[in-house]
């Protein structure tokens, strides 16, 4: 930019130093200052100041004496430098003063404002109830605020009820930015306020956002009505912005010419006191709809429909007429699909698509056709279903017109026999080609009734001359088709002569809703040609309708080979429905009403029939004769392939079945579609792989001579020491990674004799670097395999010399013997051993011998396999020639079997223990090495945490000791998640406690660690709604209270809202005569609030001991006592109480139930509870992502040592959980609800010598026997909130 100014400003300066001496250098600065102060792209002016100073100092002189010429030169320079054609410098010596400004609106009367506005405003109602509004100047906010009521009453109300609106801006060259919201708001759908533009004003250096008005006086234009904006090449400024905004909002269709591409505010400013003026855009749009995208300024608004401005209104009315018809078009289209479309199962999806289709962008018939066809064919996947534009002569007269049958009647057959013979001769061309090949050509299809009449003549003149031919070529290249009624009859002549009726195809006709099966006819004039002789159909792009049907069905049935061009794809059995009729034509739907379904269940959806051999039509006959010659050897090739499989394939158990299937497919004509060795090889490969499930079976065509398979391999060549050193460096990569982790990569498997020959050098140059590492990574990701004879030697290095290990077994098809492969007793160099970790990296590229090594190491659990599933190669592959042809079969000749299971290795290859992309396999292996190094420490830490914190100290110490002895079980752990799963299983087996858990929680999930992350405490205001939602209360029949809550809260948390609990929960049930507490869905929680909850169900007086809790971490026993003071009124001990339980009842809910049952205060009805535990604690294990959840406390209140942990609370009345509430209500209704105070409670109060342990009476009132171990002294209570702690 600096360089541009440096070139431009010398021109300015030099031009101002002409002989007239009227121009001073200061004028350059003034002109530049006008730009700096007013140009709306100030960022484009960076560097101008320095360029000006440099230009002023320049002594170059450009002698332009004419100021008009100078103005033109300066304009071209400025526009070129700033790339803005709106910048214009003009010389106007006659303009002595600035043009007078229009009087301010505030100084005009209302009548003057209205008169001025009416000059540029016209409105009328056009034909078809289309509103027309022409605006030649956009008034500003001051005018609109004064005249809005007038405009609404006299203009808008006449237009708002029209069915569509045309807004004519063709003559609008400007206006006020402040008027934009008024225009947009009345056309903007909805009641929301929208940001439609942002305007930057350079003189004030301010940015103003333009929003639609929050309230519009009068009614807005309905969103479902179309709006069209007319534009011309003169439309400029604010009018362009309005057109662009409405187009971007998809609220209007712009019709006409591209607009001028002006500016929102273009001003002509005098340069200093000179006669030069600079026209400059002082404000700009920063992006319609606030998106900041490229706007219309400088380029103009591109119309949706381009047309000359003078024709824009006419074109707009045509667009509106089309859009008014759209709902009817869619409705007629949906009706036609429901009534006629043959693929009924696809109709609902089509109807749904049409109902949801967005047609807002449709402005022409071509647009509509394109959009409808794209949608219909994408959803239906049926190319036959399409909408077309039709001209008047093509337009359908109605839904009755269809292409299903020709309108003309069946022609009458002449009675004269000579004429009939001549007619047959004219239609059919018959000859016998060399090689006894029949040739039959006919160029049209007749109706079945015509063929029936002419049958004897056709038999004698056409069919009998072809009966004794060896093959038949049927020429349909010039056949445009005709009625399809004769197709089943023609097909019948190609069935086997002695066969019963054959199902040829079926058809479904939507009009009759009938599926019809078509069978071959057995009673024919003459003998069928049969299926054993070759039939070849010649086709071209002119082959159509019934001729296409015949070609398709002959190919589908496997009775013919097609040669030639793809057929026309012109089908019968369609129906034409008129969707729209206009004077220029209209739209019509072509809908298929009948579907062909072949014997494979495939529907033919039209389109051309693709030949088996595609050639030009004029070459089809020659090509068919070539294919015929190839097919003479087809049987021998297929059967020869089967014989090779029987002799050499390594899986004899499937060979017999594969041979039978090949012969069956050959007899069925399945290989008639093969037209050369290449296509036959492809088809045989696909069939063999599908039959066997073995992707290693290949048949291929090789025109060149292949090396004989039996040729003995050359003896291994032992390289020189120099060559060997170079080869080892190139083929082997070794490295010792941090942590004494060895890394070995080699990308090929050498033959055993070669390995033995260079063994000492390999040991010295490769193996010695790795043998003393702590663990080893063997990288086979890039190893395609090759020789497998060296695999046992490689495996032997990773096992001890004795005892020898059985690696795998090999079944050899040639000898039918199974050979066991074992480790070698002696190897060169030191063994790696069997105790150090081994990791094998594999990928999709790893094959044959590399897979054998990975399979063996995985099968014997000697290595961890990491990477991608391997290729699934073979130990040995044989390639055999099929007869003397250029066809070859490649197949595995040996099969490897697992040493541990005796089963053959999976044909799909090696499935890794850890499946990851090959690119991260090495880093995954290193992570596992690091993890396994941590395992001893992790087990030690876990044992110590259990010993120090488990609720049963003796069992915790025992578990820690036994856990250390299980370290070998963790030798093959591959992830922290697997380690957590294994550790949890061991701990639960050792303890018998399912609540002792291990979790793997990654760093990004730390917020879900139980007991580690504190729960956020909501505000008391939020708590009120939370309480209403969490607690369910009711008063049942007989004044029986009902209370359900599904989780216990923390004591400290509930203390803050005790008054809310009393107000919204407790007061609703405290005055009932009996209470049902529903714990069936309560999953527990903190136990700190149990003392307070229990206290409400005992009378005020000396505290009662509820339970004793042993806490292992601090090795202490705490006592739970009732509280002496509570928030709200007590329920007391005299009223009946029932607790409902289920197998879901857990944790704190079990503790509460256990206490109330043991003290005889409540009757428990339902199911045995889950047998949970006191709230456990979670501990982090070292620097891993493992967390141990350990039950650290247990109830020890019972004298006999029993508790509910692990076994659950047994109900007094056992019933299914869903029946518990009903049973409780029944028992409460048949029992007196008041009872005298139980003597047991008197005996359990503070200060009594005898204390009682009671049992629940029939309804949970205290009835007791003496139990001296329960009552002890309690500390004096203090006032607590509801559900507060002691």
From Swiss-Prot:
This protein's UniProt keywords: Extracellular matrix, Glycoprotein, Repeat, Secreted, Signal, Transport, Vitamin A
A GO CC term attached to the entry: extracellular region
Signal peptide: 1-17
Propeptide residue intervals: 18-22
MF term (GO), any: retinol binding
Stretches for region Disordered: 389-415, 1227-1286
Gene3D superfamilies hit by this protein: 2-enoyl-CoA Hydratase, Chain A, domain 1, 3.30.750.44
CDD domains the UniProt entry points to: Peptidase_S41_IRBP (cd07563)
Basic residues bias locations: 1233-1252
Swiss-Prot/TrEMBL Sequence repeat ranges: 23-323, 324-631, 632-932, 933-1231
Pfam families tied to this protein: Peptidase_S41, Peptidase_S41_N
Glycan attachment sites: 107, 161, 205, 513, 1114
Function: IRBP shuttles 11-cis and all trans retinoids between the retinol isomerase in the pigment epithelium and the visual pigments in the photoreceptor cells of the retina.
Family affiliation: Belongs to the peptidase S41A family.
Protein name as it appears in the record: Retinol-binding protein 3
């Amino acid at each position: 930019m600096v360089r541009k100014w440096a070139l431009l400003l010398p021109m300015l300066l030099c031009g101002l130093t002409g002989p007239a001496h009227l121009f001073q250098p200061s004028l350059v600065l003034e002109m530049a200052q006008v730009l700096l102060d007013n140009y709306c792209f100030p960022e484009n002016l960076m560097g101008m100041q320095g360029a000006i100073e440099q230009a002023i100092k320049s002594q170059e002189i450009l002698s332009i004496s004419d100021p008009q010429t100078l103005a033109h030169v300066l304009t071209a320079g400025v526009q070129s430098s700033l790339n803005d054609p709106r910048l214009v410098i003009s010389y106007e010596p006659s303009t002595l003063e600035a043009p007078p400004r229009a009087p301010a609106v505030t100084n005009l009367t209302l009548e003057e404002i209205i008169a001025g506005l009416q000059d540029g405003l016209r409105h009328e109602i056009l034909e078809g109830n289309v509103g027309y509004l022409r605006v030649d100047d956009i008034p500003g906010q001051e005018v609109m605020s004064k005249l809005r009521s007038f405009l609404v009453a006299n203009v808008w109300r006449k237009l708002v009820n029209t069915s569509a609106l045309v807004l004519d801006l063709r003559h609008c060259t400007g206006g006020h930015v402040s008027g934009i919201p008024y225009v947009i708001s009345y056309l903007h759908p909805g009641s929301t306020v929208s940001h439609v533009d942002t305007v930057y004003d350079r003189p004030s250096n301010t940015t103003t956002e333009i929003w639609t008005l929050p309230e519009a006086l009068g009614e807005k234009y309905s969103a479902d009505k179309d709006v069209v904006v007319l534009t011309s090449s003169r439309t400029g400024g604010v009018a362009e912005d309005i057109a662009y905004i409405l187009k971007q909002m998809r609220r209007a269709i712009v019709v006409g010419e591209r607009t001028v591409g002006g500016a929102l505010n273009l001003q002509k400013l005098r340069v200093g006191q000179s006669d030069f003026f600079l026209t400059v855009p002082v404000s700009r749009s920063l992006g319609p709809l606030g998106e900041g995208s490229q706007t219309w300024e400088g380029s103009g608004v591109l119309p949706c429909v381009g047309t000359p401005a003078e024709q824009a209104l006419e074109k707009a009315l045509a667009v509106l007429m089309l859009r008014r018809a759209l709902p009817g078009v869619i409705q007629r289209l949906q009706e036609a699909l429901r009534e006629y479309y043959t693929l009924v199962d696809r109709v609902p999806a089509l109807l749904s698509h049409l109902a949801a289709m967005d047609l807002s962008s449709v402005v022409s018939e071509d647009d509509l056709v394109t959009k409808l066809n794209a949608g219909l064919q994408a959803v239906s996947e049926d190319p036959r279903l399409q909408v077309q534009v039709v001209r008047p002569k093509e337009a359908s007269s109605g839904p009755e017109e269809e292409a299903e049958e020709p309108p003309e009647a069946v022609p009458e057959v002449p009675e004269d026999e000579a004429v009939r013979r001549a007619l047959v001769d004219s239609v059919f061309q018959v000859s016998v080609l060399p090689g006894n090949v029949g040739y039959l050509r006919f160029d049209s299809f007749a109706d079945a009734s015509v063929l029936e009449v002419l049958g004897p003549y056709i038999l004698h003149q056409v069919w009998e001359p072809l009966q004794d031919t060896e093959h038949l070529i049927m020429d349909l290249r010039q056949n445009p088709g005709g009625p399809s009624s004769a197709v089943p009859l023609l097909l019948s002549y190609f069935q086997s002569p002695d066969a019963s009726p054959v199902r040829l195809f079926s058809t479904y006709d939507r009009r009759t809703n009938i599926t019809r099966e078509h069978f071959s006819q057995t009673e024919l004039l003459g003998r069928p040609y049969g299926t054993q002789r070759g039939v070849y159909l010649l086709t071209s792009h002119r082959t159509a309708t019934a001729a296409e049907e015949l070609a398709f069905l002959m190919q589908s049935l496997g009775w013919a080979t097609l040669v030639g061009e793809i057929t026309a794809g012109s089908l019968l059995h369609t129906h034409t429905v008129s969707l729209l009729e206009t004077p220029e034509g209209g739209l019509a739907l072509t809908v298929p009403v009948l579907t062909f379904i072949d014997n494979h269940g495939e529907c033919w959806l039209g389109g051309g029939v693709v030949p088996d051999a595609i050639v030009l039509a004029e070459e089809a006959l020659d090509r068919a004769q070539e294919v015929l010659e190839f097919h003479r050897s087809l049987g021998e090739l297929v059967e020869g392939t089967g014989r090779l499989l029987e002799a050499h394939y390594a899986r004899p158990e499937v060979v017999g079945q594969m041979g039978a299937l090949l012969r069956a497919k050959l007899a069925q004509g399945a290989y008639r579609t093969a037209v050369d060795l290449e296509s036959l090889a492809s088809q045989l490969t696909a069939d063999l792989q599908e039959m066997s499930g073995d992707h290693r079976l290949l048949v291929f065509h090789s025109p060149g001579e292949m090396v004989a398979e039996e040729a003995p391999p050359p003896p291994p060549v032992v390289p020189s020491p120099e060559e060997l050193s170079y080869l080892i460096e190139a083929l082997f990569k070794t490295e010792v990674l941090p942590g004494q982790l060895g890394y070995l990569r080699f990308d090929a498997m050498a033959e055993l004799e070669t390995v033995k020959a260079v063994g000492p050098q390999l040991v010295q140059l490769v193996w010695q670097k790795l043998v003393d590492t702590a663990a080893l990574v063997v990288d086979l990701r890039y190893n395609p395999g090759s020789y497998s004879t060296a695999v046992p030697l490689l495996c032997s290095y990773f096992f001890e010399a004795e005892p020898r290990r059985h690696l795998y077994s090999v079944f050899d098809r040639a000898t039918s013997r199974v050979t066991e492969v074992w480790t070698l007793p002696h190897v060169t160099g030191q063994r790696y051993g069997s105790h150090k970790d081994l990791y094998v990296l594999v990928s999709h590229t790893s094959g044959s011998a590399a897979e054998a090594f990975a399979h063996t190491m995985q099968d014997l659990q000697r290595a961890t396999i990491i990477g991608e599933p391997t290729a699934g190669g073979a130990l040995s592959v044989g390639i055999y020639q099929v007869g003397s042809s250029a066809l070859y079969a490649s197949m595995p000749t040996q099969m490897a079997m697992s040493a541990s299971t005796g089963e053959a290795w999976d044909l799909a290859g090696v499935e890794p223990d850890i499946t990851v992309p090959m690119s991260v396999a090495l880093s995954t292996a290193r992570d596992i090495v690091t993890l396994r190094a941590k395992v001893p420490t992790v087990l030690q830490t876990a044992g110590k945490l259990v010993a120090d914190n488990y609720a049963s100290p003796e069992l915790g110490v025992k578990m820690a000791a036994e856990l250390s002895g299980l370290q070998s079980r963790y030798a093959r752990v591959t992830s922290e998640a697997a380690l957590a799963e294994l550790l949890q299983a061991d701990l639960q087996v050792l303890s018998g406690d399912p609540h002792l858990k291990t979790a793997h929680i990654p760093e990004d999930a730390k917020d879900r660690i139980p007991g580690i992350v504190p729960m956020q405490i909501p505000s008391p205001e939020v708590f009120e709604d939370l309480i209403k939602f969490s607690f369910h209360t009711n008063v049942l029949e007989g004044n029986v209270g009902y209370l359900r809550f599904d989780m216990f809260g923390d004591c400290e948390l509930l203390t803050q809202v005790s008054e809310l609990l009393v107000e919204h929960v407790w007061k609703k049930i405290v005055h009932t005569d009996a209470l049902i507490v529903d714990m069936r869905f309560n999953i527990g929680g903190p136990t700190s609030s149990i003392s307070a909850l229990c206290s409400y169900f005992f009378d005020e007086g000396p505290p009662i001991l509820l339970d004793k809790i042993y806490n292992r971490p601090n090795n202490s026993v705490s006592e739970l006592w009732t509280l002496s003071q509570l928030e709200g009124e007590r329920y007391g001990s005299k009223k009946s109480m029932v607790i409902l339980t289920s197998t879901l009842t857990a944790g704190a809910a079990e503790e509460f139930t256990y206490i109330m049952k043991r003290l005889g205060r409540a009757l428990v009805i339902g199911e045995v509870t889950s047998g949970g535990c006191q709230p456990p604690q979670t501990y982090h294990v070292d620097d891993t992502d493992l967390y141990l959840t350990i039950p650290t406390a247990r109830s020890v209140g019972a004298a006999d040592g029993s508790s509910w942990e692990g076994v659950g609370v047994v109900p007094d009345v056992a019933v299914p959980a869903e029946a518990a509430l009903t049973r409780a209500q029944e028992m409460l209704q048949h029992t007196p609800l008041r009872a005298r105070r139980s003597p047991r409670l008197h005996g359990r109060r503070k200060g009594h010598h005898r204390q009682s342990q009671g049992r629940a009476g029939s309804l949970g009132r205290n009835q007791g026997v003496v139990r001296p171990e329960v009552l002890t002294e309690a500390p004096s209570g203090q006032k607590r909130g509801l559900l507060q702690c002691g």
